[in-house]
Amino acid sequence: MKKKIEMDGEAKGSCEEYEALSRRGFLGVTASAAGALSMAPSFVLGSEPSRSGNNGRDVLVVVYLRGGMDGLTAVVPYGDQALYSARPTLAVPPPGQTDGAIDLDGFFGLSPALAPLMAPYNAGELAFVQATGSPDPSLSHFEAQYFMESATPNMGHTGINTGWIGRHLSTVSPLGAGLFRGVGWSPMLALGLVGANGVLSIKSPSDFVFPGEPATEALRRQLYLEMYSQTIEPLKGAAASSLPTVDLLASVNFANYSPANGASYPASSFGEQLGYTAATIKADIGLEVAHIDIPSWDTHANMGPLTGTLATKLADLGAGLEAFWRDLGSDIDKVTVVVMSEFGRRVEENDSEGTDHGQGGCMFVMGGNVDGGQVISQWPGLDPVSLGNGNLPITIDYRDILAEILEDRLESPSAADVFLGYQPTYQNVTF
């Protein structure tokens, strides 16, 4: 068995704010939202079976890169010479040079660490979006993650404690019984998922079991239901649905899952969680959304875009996504993957061989119904006049991308409701 590579530690050279959030395990859930969730047993966030859904919807897989991923290293604007003036030691070289970017379209290139992603890109099932992000100007991890996941940038602290994914799920009928609509492969529920029933937050499927000896399981289940039948909602309803959800997950048989089509997931937490997601999708038990967090993208010092910290993290990201795409095969036609981060990095490198908090970044969108093989961008330029404050401007709001996916692929009746009145401008990222 391969030894699992631990990729979950704090980023070397990350800022004090990010390290504090990492130590607390902050994943975007505000105190009041977390308090509401804690009213249910820690392993129960299910709902009673409800209406049947439309099985034509895509499964949404959200990969959140916490800490602020450097989009200028991932998708390199090598055609903009100002990049090399701003980053004389950190910029990925142009295509054709040693350790150079892999050409995508004559202007943008892919980090060599992400080379596996050329397969879905060339197949027309992966697109990149550059100079995108949230218009929240704070550049604080805490603020940026909150506003991005609640989809409330520039609205201030309104007390909204639901996330854009949770609000989406609350506006559409469940697929199947609605017991297991969404999962966050994490000990804590990401704010983006808050606001819908049938959503679990578990680090591993092995964490969601009914413990004890098989010989006494029937009796223990009976006593468990009797105990919670005397309580109030939401405990009563959560307990009633928890056991069917345990049985539903047990039917997937994660322990014996074998990837298809020669796919090989990286031996990391990310690779493991992608494997769980693929197994659940193939089991067709009603999953609508999976959320995966990858921490430690805050690269203030010793960034290492070619051989160091960032290159290692990008390699894990690229290998995992390619394996997931390959493993799903034709099932990728009913899946859309979105990769996002709270902000990008400042254009100019700092004196610690790293980059500081910036604004515009990049997103990845992958799936069988993605208009891939392209970089979607309204490129503003990296010269000092175009930058203004030294950060890459946001020319495509991240909600434009998400709203298009929700309406085109997930049958959202109104993205404006999910995004609280925001009127998106579609970028033709999906068919």
Per-segment meaning from a language model:
Residues 358:
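Conserved active-site-proximal phosphate/metal-binding subdomains
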Residues 321, 325-352:
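Metal-dependent active-site segment of extracytoplasmic phospho-/sulfohydrolases and closely related
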Residues 2-327, 348, 362-431:
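Feature for exported/extracytoplasmic and membrane-associated proteins, marking the mature portion
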